[in-house]
């Protein structure tokens, strides 16, 4: 399981970085060709190959190797201005990869325990708020507690853990004959998030780019009831 999480995280982060660099090509290999080679490399490297023996196994191994070499070429490639492969930010898929890694890592310890996941969700949401405030003074404390090398200041991870929490609530309380209890829980969570959004708005703007707590709370205020609505449908 750990290996699966690791390699899926690597794939998402790599795809995010390649997608980001495809838009910065200036001369030489065109943006279109970079993107085409990039996608081919993705499919060859991370494609799900059937189990095989003999010649087919050799062929699949060669295809995967070709994908890795193709992506390696794109990493070392420099355009006509000498611009190399860059990591300016992680890209959308890269952020998803980091979110997946953190949330999956937490779930390895909490498993299907609703109580443990609820606590983990609360802690991650709290970290998202704290990371945008001055509640932890000092550079040392911030580095140890907030882990700034993890992008999005815990906001995206709060979204991920909200999904985990909702899934476990559905597993525990959802009932087709009596859906009201589960939907009521989600609506209550939505109201709670709306209250937090209104309370936090004077302190932070609504900004997706900055991943502010206010944006997080407004999004969750919509997410929980909407999930209940689609479940009812």
Spans of model-derived segments:
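Alpha-helical transmembrane segments and their immediate juxtamembrane cytosolic regions
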Residues: 1-233
């Amino acid at each position: 399981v750990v290996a699966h999480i690791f390699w899926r995280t690597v794939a998402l982060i790599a795809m995010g970085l390649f997608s980001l660099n495809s838009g910065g090509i200036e001369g030489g290999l065109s943006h279109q060709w970079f993107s085409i080679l990039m996608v081919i490399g993705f499919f060859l490297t991370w494609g799900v190959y059937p189990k095989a023996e003999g010649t087919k196994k050799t062929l699949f191994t060669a295809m995967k190797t070709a994908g890795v070499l193709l992506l390696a070429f794109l990493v070392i490639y420099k355009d006509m201005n000498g611009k190399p492969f860059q990591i300016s930010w992680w890209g959308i898929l890269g952020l998803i990869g980091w979110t997946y890694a953190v949330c999956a890592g937490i779930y390895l310890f909490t498993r299907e325990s609703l109580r443990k996941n609820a606590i983990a969700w609360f802690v991650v949401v709290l970290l998202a708020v704290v990371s945008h405030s001055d509640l932890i003074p000092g550079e040392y404390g911030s580095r140890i507690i907030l882990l700034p090398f993890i992008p999005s200041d815990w906001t995206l991870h709060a979204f991920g853990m909200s999904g985990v929490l909702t899934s476990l609530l559905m597993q525990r309380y959802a009932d087709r004959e009596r859906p009201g209890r589960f939907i009521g829980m989600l609506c209550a969570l939505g109201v709670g998030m709306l209250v937090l959004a209104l309370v936090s708005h004077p302190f932070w703007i609504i900004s997706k780019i900055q991943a502010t707590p206010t944006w997080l709370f407004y999004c969750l205020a919509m997410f929980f009831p909407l999930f209940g609505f689609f479940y009812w449908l």
